[in-house]
């Protein structure tokens, strides 16, 4: 039987923050089984903890959305190491976590009541800003006007898992997108 833990990252209050699924012992699972579990769990990402395959890392973590595997997930990484530290599955920090985005250092600070998990992400990379045609297409896809965008570049930024950064003029317009 596989246990899926539900962990709220970036918060000290239950049922707030950014929720992730975490499976602490995934060595027996196939890639398809991990994908099926992530789809069943339904969280934006579910992390699967695997034993290290060599001495280049202390832990191997794979991340799945309900539809596909992704190289890294910040909040699921924080959730995974918080859970491991508070359930006795890991006490030796810092450590090196192998992910699809590379080998990342993870540290734990504080006491059991107020743990702080620190992960060092990969080097940030900024891709070319969107051109006018791409900005128009994005505004249409989001259901907003181009005038809702701040006068800053819209571009893909990555530290291992690419995201489109869309600066909005208004917090209200941003909230309407959710």
PLM features: what roles do these ranges have?
Residues 1-72, 78-178:
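Active-site proximal loop and beta-alpha junction motif in alpha/beta enzyme cores
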């Amino acid at each position: 039987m596989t246990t899926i833990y539900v962990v709220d990252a970036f918060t000290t209050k239950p049922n707030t923050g950014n929720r992730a699924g975490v499976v602490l012992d995934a060595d027996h699972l196939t890639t398809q089984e991990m994908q099926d579990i992530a789809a069943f769990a339904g969280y934006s990402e579910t992390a699967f903890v695997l034993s290290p395959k060599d001495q280049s890392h202390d832990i191997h973590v794979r991340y799945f959305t309900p539809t596909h595997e992704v190289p890294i997930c910040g909040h699921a990484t924080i959730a995974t190491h918080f859970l491991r530290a508070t359930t006795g599955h890991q006490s030796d920090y810092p450590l090196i976590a192998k992910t699809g985005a590379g080998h990342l250092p993870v540290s734990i600070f504080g006491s059991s009541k107020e743990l702080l998990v620190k992960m060092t992400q990969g080097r940030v990379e900024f891709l070319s800003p969107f051109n006018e045609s791409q900005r128009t297409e994005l505004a249409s896809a989001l259901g907003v006007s181009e005038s809702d965008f701040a006068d800053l570049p819209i571009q893909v930024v990555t530290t291992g898992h690419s995201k489109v950064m869309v600066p909005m003029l208004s917090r209200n317009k941003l909230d309407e997108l959710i």
